[in-house]
């Protein structure tokens, strides 16, 4: 089961931060992350990074195993929850094969960190039940997500993270059912599965 944690400082070898644009100039947007912004911006510029929404770039780092830059597009004074949800989800989808990551995206409210958590969680889905059994064919999604925020010790933030876990768990269930071929998800097996789920309620 996917776990979502809160922290005031990044505690994972993989760090996810935002990358956006002010005019035509790239800018890194993050919270509670200790990174060499100037050097990273030089590298990103030389690589031809755009900072556009849905762009994801992964770079090795001295302080982290990996820094993941997820596009935020044009930088505004406030980022909408939907944009943050989308950015977190895009990054998570590029992290198959890794166990955990810290998401240090910019935010100003609990509603925004809730969106980050939901996006990261929903992006951490992979249906592998009927895939090949070799290691190369089995790339598991993130099993642990940490959201870096100054709201880490607040009750509202903790409630929002629990809600994000529940949303992800139930969404994954529906996706699994949709992705299971009819030859495996017969009416009888579906009934047994729903009874098992109902017994947990």
Place the predicted regions along the sequence by residue:
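Short amphipathic alpha-helical segment within the helicase RecA-like ATPase core
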Residues: 1-201
């Amino acid at each position: 089961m996917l776990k979502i944690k809160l922290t005031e400082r990044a505690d994972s070898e993989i760090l996810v931060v935002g990358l956006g644009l002010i005019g035509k100039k790239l800018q890194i947007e993050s919270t509670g992350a200790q990174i060499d912004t100037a050097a990273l911006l030089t590298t990103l510029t030389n690589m031809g990074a755009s900072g556009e929404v849905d762009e994801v770039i992964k770079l090795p780092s001295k302080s982290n195993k990996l820094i993941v830059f997820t596009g935020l597009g044009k930088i505004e004074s406030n980022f909408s929850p939907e944009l943050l949800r989308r950015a977190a989800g895009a990054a998570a989808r590029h992290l198959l094969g890794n166990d955990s990551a810290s998401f240090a995206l910019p935010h100003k409210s609990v509603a925004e960190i809730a969106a980050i958590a939901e996006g990261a969680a929903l992006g951490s889905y992979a249906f592998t039940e009927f895939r090949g059994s070799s290691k190369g064919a089995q790339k598991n999604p993130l099993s642990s997500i940490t959201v870096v925020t100054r709201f880490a010790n607040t009750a509202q933030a903790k409630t929002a993270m629990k809600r994000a876990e529940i949303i992800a768990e139930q969404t994954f269930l529906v996706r699994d059912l949709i992705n299971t071929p009819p030859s495996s998800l017969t009416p009888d097996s579906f009934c047994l599965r729903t009874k098992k789920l109902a017994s947990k309620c």
